[in-house]
Structure formats: structure tokens, C-alpha cells
Amino acid sequence: MERIETRGLVLYNRNFREDDKLVKIFTEKAGKRMFFVKHASKSKLVASIQPLTYADFIVKINDDGLSYIEDFHQVQPFKNINGDIFKLSYATYILALADAALQDKVYDPALFAFLVKTLDLMESGLDYEVLTNIFEIQLLGRFGISLNFHECAFCHRVGLPFDYSYKYSGVLCPQHYQQDERRAYLDPNVPYLLDQFQAISFDELETISIKPEMKRKLRFFIDQLYEEYVGIHLKSKKFIDDLSSWGQIMKPRTENEETE
């Protein structure tokens, strides 16, 4: 087994036998790996194997079975996310989405950095719903999906009030709406924002300001895209959907919602 030191993000853990755990960690240097932790509740590793824990790990990598954690340091627990059920539910969802998008043992430092940066921005207080939307749109490529929100699929003009066509996996300008009678009939701001989401770099993102009604439209359409093109159904996503109903009782009203 190869011994390495790597940054890692705990995706989840689950019980194994009486007091052991299997811990799924997305590592920067070795991709996603499953680690075996014996007597987990009494182990010195217990603080490092909780979901949404980001740390430096010293590990032994086994390409033919379970890997092992030797030690850890510099733990970042994402306290703000863990202290808010709404942020936590969305963070848990993007962890599950990243897990679904990448096979185990595949080296993907770009996705690792993107996932960690998304969580950092959530932790800093940026809009977790919109950050999740951006993550979902940019992650489509990992599922082998390429969608065009930038230019008309026929005339290639840009900057127009586009609508989306599932038939052409891209947008249509008003002149070519008739090419697909079953187009999505979207608010033109939805494909406009998704085009921005595809291109944006989180290193440049400082503020997010999107009204609640537009966020609902984005959520609805991105759900349709994932159903049509990806077809995965994650438990963490269902929990988010449930939050949109009963969770509103607990959620503090934002300034935008109060002025609507």
C-alpha cells in the first residue's frame, strides 16, 4: 500500500460491524476512497471522520480494497454550515452529487478544488441555493452532458430572449422558437443566468443577489435538466425538496422576500 499525505474532504461515513466505520473521503491526490476505521468511537480519528470535515490526512492507499487513515491535522469543520440546517442540507447534497459524478479512485484535483471552494463560499455566507445551482450546472460536464445556453442553436446569435429546447439541447432565439413546439417556455432570465453560471469562476465571485422568485424558477428548471439528462435521484436532494415546504416555517425572511 502507498503511504501519502493529502488534503481530503469527508463525504460520509457509515457503521460497519459493531464499532467500526467505513468512511468515504474525496482526497486531492488519490480521488475518492473508502477507508476502514476500527473502533471508531474510541479512535483518535473520530474528529476527522465526520461528514463535511476538511483536513490533511496521512493515509495508506489500497487499490484493491479498503484504505486506512494513519493520522490527520489542520481540521476545518465548516462550523457555519453545520450550524444551519438549510446550509447543511445543500452542502450534503453537493457532496452526494460530486460522489455520483466521479468514479472511485479517479484522480480529479479540479473537481476536488471546485467542491472545496463551493463549501468555502457557503461557509462565508454567500447564497447557498445559488452556489448549489452553479455547482449543478458546471458539474453536468462530469456526467457527459454539454448544454448550450449562450447562443441560438440555429443562427448562433447571442444576447437575445432565449428559450430552451430539449430537442436541440440548447437555446432558441425568438426567430427560431417555431423549430421546437415543445420548447420549455422559460422566463428568458433563466437561460441568461444559466449561461452566466456555466462561465463564472468562483475565484471572481464576491456577491450574489437573485430574487426568491427567480431562484424558484432556476430550481425548477435545473431539476428538469437533471431529470432529463442525468436521471439520478439522491436522498439528499429529496430532503432539500421537502425543506422547500415545511422548512419555510423555520427559515428567516430575507430582505428581498420582505420587500416583494
Curated annotation (Swiss-Prot):
Keywords: DNA damage, DNA recombination, DNA repair. It comes from the Bacteria. The keyword DNA damage applies. One of its GO terms (cellular component) is bacterial nucleoid. The keyword DNA repair applies. SUPFAM superfamilies: ArfGap/RecO-like zinc finger (SSF57863), Nucleic acid-binding proteins (SSF50249). One of its GO terms (biological process) is double-strand break repair. Involved in DNA repair and RecF pathway recombination. Belongs to the RecO family. This is DNA repair protein RecO.
